[in-house]
């Protein structure tokens, strides 16, 4: 069997007397979109935060491509090729599209200007950003130099996704990527997710939107009471089944139980 891109075993995270993650397991396979669903307070965001370094587990281990890792911050995870598209997008409204694409990893000019004056190579950054947006069919903006605050909600989401796809070498985490978007903009984001998957980049998708989950996910990780309840194939179950598993109204089949 192919080694999972990321695997978590027996993860525990406590906040005082509250156990947010209770000996939970997790697995993301190569080239897939894995949706993570669960009721509010189920711990789905907590397990993903543990994987990307936003929190440090109290117990358990995390393996990236079969090798144990321990991230102390999301920056360390990013350096290993793990990108995150946050629900709030983490974009700087006043900065240009190109500047947002390169926040924290700007390209400096060659020679003394870059070495001593730390001058940025704006043309190189703008070309890279333009190329990446074009690859994903997102060059509907007027200019790569325009501030992000002038973009629509869907276009901003596209910039965040393009940034993640441009630099991810392991996988991408997307937190509620269609939240607060209209029908047309949501459709574009779903197409982007499928496009990124087609490029071979696996995705962890956290979402409450069941129709969207069932449309793009290859597998669905159902989280309940701080741990993985089961992982199901959306082709074999209905949205009603998933909600019933998630809320405890229905027991998952024995062969799918984690």
Residue ranges of model-derived segments:
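Glycine-rich phosphate-binding loops of nucleotide-dependent enzymes
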Residues: 2-258
